[in-house]
Structures are given as structure tokens and as C-alpha cells.
Regions:
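Short loop/helix-cap segments at secondary-structure boundaries that form the rim of catalytic
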Residues: 39-45, 57-61, 103
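Catalytic cysteine-centered active loop of the rhodanese-like fold, especially the PTP/DSP P-loop
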Residues: 60-104
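A short, well-structured beta->alpha microelement
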Residues: 13-17, 46-55
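Short amphipathic alpha-helix with an adjacent loop that forms part of the alpha/beta core around
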Residues: 21-22, 54-63
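Short, hinge-like loop/turn segments at secondary-structure boundaries
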Residues: 48-49, 110-114
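Hydrophobic/aromatic beta-strand patches that form the interior of the parallel beta-sheet core
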Residues: 31, 48-50, 67, 94
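Short active-site oxyanion
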Residues: 24-30, 45-46, 91-92
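Flexible, polar/low-complexity N-terminal or interdomain linker segments that lie immediately upstream
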Residues: 1-39, 112-119
């Protein structure tokens, strides 16, 4: 799966848009595309895990509002998983391209084995 090839694309969201989505209280699925280790280490609270190949999509319905992210702008996993979801017919897919590093840079909470306990 090459995420840079043309085809259907997910909407890109930034940190403030993701914060607003969380604050709204409306249900959505926040999905981290990462290795098992990466997901266990640090993630945005409430995130679901999808492996970097997008192989385990159970728990996601085609009409769910879904935001996919990974570690940072250079990580291609979230772009690839977002593209795969759109190609599979998921209708409301967004891609938080800044990822975990952008979220942390904003001083926002994280959870996981490597998350600072003081946040």
C-alpha cells in the first residue's frame, strides 16, 4: 500500500480541529496507526489501535466518524490507513497529519507506558 499514490483521500485536520471534535462530545473513533509497541508507549487518550498495515479494522463501522493519526508528519502509516479506509468505503475519514508529536507540542494529554504521569 503506497500512501503517496493518487486516489481517494481523507480530509486533513489539524490540532485545533481535533481538539474541537473531542470537546464537542459527539461520538467518533480516534485511531492510532502504529506498531503494538508504539501504541502502548504513547497515544492520545481514548485512541483505538490499528496496525501500520491497516489489517485490523474490526471495531470500525463504515458510517463511523474516524480520525486517523500516527507519530508525526513524516510517518506514512496514518496516511496509508486513512487512504485504505476511504478505498474500502468508509465515509467519514479524517487524517490528523501532525500526529502525536504535534499533539504533545501543544501540551495536550497523552497516555501510555511512556506518558509523563504529571499530565
Amino acid at each position: 500500500m503506497n500512501p503517496d499514490q493518487e486516489g481517494p483521500r481523507a480530509k486533513i485536520v489539524d490540532r485545533s480541529e481535533l481538539q474541537a471534535k473531542i470537546a464537542s462530545g459527539r461520538p467518533f473513533k480516534l485511531v492510532m496507526a502504529a506498531s503494538d509497541f508504539g501504541f502502548r508507549a504513547k497515544r492520545i487518550p481514548g485512541s483505538l489501535h490499528v496496525d501500520v498495515r491497516g489489517a485490523n479494522l474490526s471495531g470500525l463501522a463504515k458510517d463511523d466518524d474516524i480520525v486517523v493519526y500516527c507519530s508525526n508528519l513524516d510517518c506514512k502509516a496514518s496516511k496509508a490507513v486513512s487512504k485504505k479506509l476511504v478505498e474500502l468505503g468508509y465515509h467519514k475519514v479524517s487524517h490528523y497529519a501532525g500526529g502525536l508529536i504535534d499533539w504533545e507540542a501543544g501540551g495536550l494529554p497523552i497516555e501510555g507506558d511512556w506518558a509523563p504521569q504529571s499530565r
